[in-house]
């Protein structure tokens, strides 16, 4: 705990016995929207054609290997593949006392994670829902689960304000 506080003085390390981190500047995260756009652009540049439309019929295809890119919707296409959508809510927050050098952080005691996103932060709810039929964010999770966990671990986050959020699916098997 004390060594963690030496590197990240804004963290309340009370109750933390073990923490891991790297400071070699070679780790990070990917913006999935931008990554998707970059992949699509490169594929188009290399001759791929993207066709959008409705499926009119299905037929059997024999192949040694099939790659499905259906993600969370795999079960609708391939019933036997055990992939289930799991709804997950992410909140966007702003804090008057911005901490510029904050790594992606996960608190395993609460399941809440957070990371910087420009001048704001993204924070994920630990509560996920299988078989959710809507993608409305679980707004109550912010007040009940996320904000208390953030404020406990990063005391200046007591002052943060919710600025947005969304829900999406993780594909789980």
Kindly give the residue locations of the regions a language model identified.
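Flavin (FAD/FMN) cofactor-binding and adjacent substrate-gating region
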Residues: 1-46, 51-52, 172
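A short alpha-helix-loop-beta-strand transition element characteristic
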Residues: 1-5, 81-84, 159
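A general structural signal for well-ordered alpha-helical segments in protein cores
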Residues: 35-36, 74, 143-147
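Short hydrophobic/aromatic beta-strand or adjacent loop that forms the aromatic wall/cage
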Residues: 17-19, 86-90, 109-111
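Active-site lid/adjacent beta-loop-alpha segment flanking the redox-cofactor pocket in flavoenzymes
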Residues: 95-173
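Central helical "cap/lid" subdomain
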Residues: 63-103
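Short, solvent-exposed loop/turn elements at beta->coil junctions and helix N-caps
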Residues: 5, 55-56, 165-170
């Amino acid at each position: 705990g004390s060594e963690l506080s030496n590197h990240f003085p804004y963290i309340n390390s009370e109750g933390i016995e073990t923490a891991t981190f790297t400071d070699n500047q070679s780790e990070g995260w990917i913006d999935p929207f931008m990554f998707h756009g970059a992949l699509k652009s490169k594929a188009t540049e290399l001759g791929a054609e993207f066709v959008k439309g409705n499926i009119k019929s299905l037929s059997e295809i024999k192949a040694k290997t099939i790659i499905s890119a259906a993600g969370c919707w795999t079960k609708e296409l391939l019933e036997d593949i055990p992939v289930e959508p799991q709804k997950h809510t992410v909140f966007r927050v702003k804090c008057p006392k911005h901490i510029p050098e904050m790594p992606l952080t996960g608190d395993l005691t609460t399941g809440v994670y957070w990371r910087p996103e420009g001048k704001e932060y993204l924070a994920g709810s630990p509560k996920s829902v299988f078989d959710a039929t809507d993608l409305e964010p679980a707004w109550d999770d912010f007040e009940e689960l996320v904000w208390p966990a953030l404020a406990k671990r990063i005391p200046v986050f007591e002052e943060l304000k919710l600025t947005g959020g969304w829900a999406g699916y993780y594909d789980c098997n």
